[in-house]
């Protein structure tokens, strides 16, 4: 058995921290875990993605068409993940847009959100989209977006990690003074999404 997660967004959204929490939780549950990360630009706003693979896997790169779950912190980055998605993939999408630097100077406009979601729905098994930034702000801080997205992922059918293991990994990897906000964000994300 294997399970593949593709996490994508832009620098500064907490993609790598989220992936580290997932990876540690999987190891704590006794799973074989491999992870890779790609930084587009080494600054806020550059594309960032990670690939996390659990179980009977040999390499850290998810083969085309084999991602079981895509956690997209930014809608356009979700579109870029299309080749990684399996036909049955669950896609979690934060609808808050952060246009990439190369699009700002491009003659091509940022696609309408409705078109992005429609394209994802045509290519994946399940798509759940919501304004994660709004939920993070309501939880106490916009920088808790990554925990909103983690909570949403944990609510999906087939997600292989338990809530308690994820929370323990959060406690090991996040500042204690922000734990209350991050836990609230995690639970709000969990309640927002249910891919069944």
Swiss-Prot record:
EC number(s) per entry: 1.2.7.8
Source organism of the structure: Methanothermobacter marburgensis (strain ATCC BAA-927 / DSM 2133 / JCM 14651 / NBRC 100331 / OCM 82 / Marburg)
Reaction(s) the record says it catalyses: indole-3-pyruvate + 2 oxidized [2Fe-2S]-[ferredoxin] + CoA = (indol-3-yl)acetyl-CoA + 2 reduced [2Fe-2S]-[ferredoxin] + CO2 + H(+)
Domain of life, source organism: Archaea
Gene: iorB
Entry function: Catalyzes the ferredoxin-dependent oxidative decarboxylation of arylpyruvates.
Alphabetic keyword roster: Oxidoreductase
EC category name: oxidoreductase
The protein's name: Indolepyruvate oxidoreductase subunit IorB
SUPFAM superfamilies: Pyruvate-ferredoxin oxidoreductase, PFOR, domain III
Activity profile over pH: Optimum pH is 10.0.
């Amino acid at each position: 058995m294997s399970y593949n997660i593709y996490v994508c967004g832009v620098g500064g959204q907490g993609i790598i921290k989220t992936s580290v929490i997932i990876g540690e939780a999987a190891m704590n549950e006794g799973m074989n875990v491999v992870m890779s990360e790609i930084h587009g630009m080494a600054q806020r706003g550059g594309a960032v993605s990670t690939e996390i693979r659990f179980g009977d896997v040999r390499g850290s790169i998810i083969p085309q068409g084999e991602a079981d779950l895509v956690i997209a912190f930014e809608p356009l980055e979700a579109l870029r993940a299309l080749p990684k998605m399996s036909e049955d993939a669950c896609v979690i999408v934060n609808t808050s847009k952060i246009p990439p630097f190369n699009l700002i100077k491009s003659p091509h406009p940022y696609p309408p959100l409705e078109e992005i979601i429609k394209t994802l729905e045509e290519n994946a098994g399940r798509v759940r989209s919501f304004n994660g930034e709004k939920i993070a702000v309501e939880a106490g801080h916009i920088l808790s977006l990554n925990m909103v997205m983690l909570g949403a992922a944990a609510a999906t059918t087939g997600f292989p990690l338990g809530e308690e293991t994820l929370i323990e990994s959060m406690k090991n990897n996040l500042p204690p003074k922000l734990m209350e906000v991050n836990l609230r964000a995690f639970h709000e994300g969990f309640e927002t999404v249910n891919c069944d």
